[in-house]
């Protein structure tokens, strides 16, 4: 085994199976690119991103761990979010929650 190597079974694997998801239209209203990582609490992303923030509370991007989505200035795109799992408490990021969801 190589450090960091991931060994999986053959076939397809569904990420985040059975978890609540939602789609949101997101626009970068700023003049610089914004990149959002896979596990960032989407409610607390850069304020230059315009979308229904209240709907995004408790959700993150529904993408593979360690990846990110980049929003270029003026770009609008639809993203799929997935509900946070585990204890459903958020600490850090921009400090807008700092506790249970």
UniProtKB/Swiss-Prot annotation:
Which catalysed reactions does the entry list for this protein? urea + 2 H2O + H(+) = hydrogencarbonate + 2 NH4(+)
| One GO BP annotation of this record | urea catabolic process
Keywords from the UniProt entry: Cytoplasm, Hydrolase
Listed InterPro entries: Urease_beta-like (IPR002019), Urease_betasu_sf (IPR036461), Urease_subunit (IPR050069)
Q: Where are the transmembrane segments?
A: none
Q: What is its main location?
A: cytoplasm
Pfam families per record: Urease_beta
Identify the enzyme class: hydrolase
A Gene Ontology CC term for this entry?
Answer: urease complex
Which compartment or compartments is the protein found in?
Answer: Cytoplasm
Domain of life according to the entry: Bacteria
EC number in record: 3.5.1.5
- Gene Ontology molecular function: urease activity
Describe which pathway this protein belongs to, using the record's wording: Nitrogen metabolism; urea degradation; CO(2) and NH(3) from urea (urease route): step 1/1
The similarity annotation says: Belongs to the urease beta subunit family.
What quaternary structure, including any partners, is listed in this protein's UniProt entry? Heterotrimer of UreA (gamma), UreB (beta) and UreC (alpha) subunits. Three heterotrimers associate to form the active enzyme.
Under the heading PANTHER family, the entry gives: UREASE (PTHR33569:SF1)
Q: What is this protein called?
A: Urease subunit beta
